[in-house]
Structure formats: C-alpha cells, structure tokens
C-alpha cells in the first residue's frame, strides 16, 4: 500500500507591486508637468486622457497646446525618444516614481493608397487630389454671392419697370430690399472675426448699395431724367464713401464707385440746372478726367495719409531738432497724457503705401470707365464734323497708352493700356453698328484684328529690349504731343471758338 504525502513548502514572501507612479511628463517648450499614472494599466489606455490633461495644463500656463501634424499617433516616450510599448504597463517597462517621460506625436511611416476598382473611382480619386473640395467657408461665400446676384437682378428688374412706368412700386420695393440687405451686412460686419467673415460681409454690403441707389433715383416723380440721375448717383457716391471710411477694405472698388458716381452726378446736375448739351457735358468730363490722371498719384498719397518729409537745409539745422512737418500740439481726452506724433514706423509706411496703391488703382479704373463712355458717346458717325471726335479719341488713346509706362505696378499700367485699347474698339464697334455698310464693317473688322495683333507684337518685343535714354526721352515727348491737342480739340468740339468769334 502506497501513501502519498504532500511535501512541506517553504514560506514565500510576496512582493507587492506599486499601483501608481508619479512621473514628470515633458511637453511644449521646456514645460514639465507632474502627473499620477496607473502603474499596471497598459500605456495605450492612458495616452489619450493624458494628452487632454497635458493640453489643459498648457493652456493654463499660456503655452500652445499639442497638436497632431498629419497622420500618426501619440506615444509616451523615454527621455531619449524611445517610445514605450503600448501593450505593456509602466511597471513592466521599469518606469517608477520620479522618472521623466516625453509625450510626442510619431508620424505614420506607412503609406496608404486607395484601391481603384472602376474607372469612375479613378476619375473621382484623381479629381479629389487636383481640386479642393467645398469647405464651409467657401460654401458661405458662394451663398452670399448668390444672394448678392439675386439682389442685383431684382434691382435691375425694378429699375426697368421705373424706366417705363411712373409709379412708386420701384421705390418701395427697392427701399425694403436695400434696408434688409444693409441690416444683414451690418450684423455680419459686427460679428466678423476672420477675413472670410469680413469677405462675406463686404459682399452683402456692396450688394446693398445698388437697391438703395435705385430707390433714391426712383423717388422723384416724372420721367427718368437728370433729377433722378443727380439723386441716384449722389446717394451712390455717399454710400460708397461711407463704406470706404468705416470699413477700410476694398479701397479700390469703393474708390472706383466714388469717382464714377461723383463725376456722373456733376454732369447730371449741370444738365438739370443749366440744360447743358450732351457734347459739352461729355467734353467737360473728358477734360476733368485728363486733369485727374495727372493729379491721381498726389491724390492717392493724400488719401492714404502719407506726408512728404521736408527737405533739410544745407546747414542741417533739423538734424537735432523736431522736424517741422510733424505736429507740435496734440488734442487728447481728459485725464490722458499727451503724446506727440513722431516719424512713421516701417510698418506704418508699408501700410500707407499699400493703401495708396489701392486708392490709385481705383482712381485709374474709375477714370478709365468715364473716358471710355465719354469718347464712345462723342464719336457719333451721323454728325457733320465726325472727324473731330475721331482725332480727339486717337490723341486720348495715345496719351493713355504712353502714360501707362510711368507706373511701377503692372496692373495700373495694364489699366491705362487697356483703357486706350477699349476706346479704339468701342468707337469702331459704334461706327460699324450705326453705319451698317459693307465698307464700314470691313474697316472695323480689320482694325479690331490688327490693333490687338500690333499690341501683342509690341508686348513681345519691348520688354526684352534695352532702349537708350534719348529714345526714352523721345517717347516721353510723343506722350506730351498726344496730350497737348486734347484741350484745344475738346474746346473746338464744344464750339467755344465759335462762341468767342461771334460774340
């Protein structure tokens, strides 16, 4: 008979493993945060909650929170950058109290590609790589553009109705539309915090100007004429000037609107008060635009707030004294310390220069629109002296084309050159439409083809050629020769010489 007895076992002293460890987590720019972590839980379980705690602590300290860059994962690492195993605990990886860890983002080294199973999937995949999708910002801008387009179309329909019917319907409807859109634009401007929000508000604000203008123009009773034009373009000018003053954005667009509205309002006012003829009004506007072309750079500088410094004397008496162009007195509110204005900083000068460029671009665009309208209206093929406006249009186009070379900004040079070409094209098209003869159509078609071809040849040759100072001076003289006959020809067209002769 066999007996089985259990062998006596020696007492084994149990070793207690720690339940939590206090470690220092390094994050941000030299920031160390002490945290209490579970010593026996897998590292992967604690990574995401630890990231939230670290980011909240960084925000409290005024530091930038940790953000992921691309595709990858967050990991706890040792001081040397070696990541801890996500499936093991801190105890299993010999991490104890007082150790330092580093939480960082590890980029994914694997490259994932989409499986293409059909040609439609390949087309969609290729298009998604080449073109950006519509995001919420673009969607809002598209919606605002659609609303602005609808407002403009509705205003145009109501204006057409007022042109044919002397009723108050246009005034009431456009006033209601203008007030509603203007209120929405003001609300968006007050709540705007980003450039995208301000862009949407600017779209709504510019669309609100048109119904307000049509409402003011349609208010005077009677057939549409100069009184309606005076009131409408006056409101348009004031509205654009207020938007320019209080928003400080879209300087070029608002400046163009102000120039066109102000000049048209003056012409309509002269027509209403003095019953001035159309030829006299258009010729006077042309001369005003020519003078404004000369004054545009100085006017844009003043609008931008740029003060020209005073040239110092030969004795340098202003080197250690206050510059005389700076103010010596200042007005402040009660309780505040007076601070005299000093020389502008580099940032202020750059900002003022950019504003001056925008103002100048708006001035050139507005003047170009007015010159094109005036010259096209003056060149009437059914008048007795139809050769005189044609000569005037030729000299005006030559002056503008050569004046464009004096501007540094290429868009401003293109504006002047484009204005000169559009004048010639518009006059030719009017002659072809009104004469309606085979000879006129043939000549106009030849001019419309040969003129851009000559411009393209000049554009391909002139920038690659270095000209002598004498040749440049000769081109400048040609510009002056084109400028000089404009005023005598315009006065001749207005019959000023005949009035002086037979007075």
Curated annotation (Swiss-Prot):
Pfam families: EccD, YukD
Keywords (A to Z) from UniProt: Cell inner membrane, Cell membrane, Membrane, Transmembrane, Transmembrane helix, Transport
Domain of life the protein comes from: Bacteria
Gene3D superfamilies noted in UniProt: Phosphatidylinositol 3-kinase Catalytic Subunit, Chain A, domain 1
UniProt subcellular location: Cell inner membrane
NCBIfam families per UniProt: T7SS_EccD
Function field: Part of the ESX-5 specialized secretion system, which is responsible for the secretion of EsxN and a number of PE_PGRS and PPE proteins, including PPE41.
Note, other: Was identified as a high-confidence drug target.
Name of the protein described by the UniProt record: ESX-5 secretion system protein EccD5
Organism for this UniProt entry: Mycobacterium tuberculosis (strain ATCC 25618 / H37Rv)
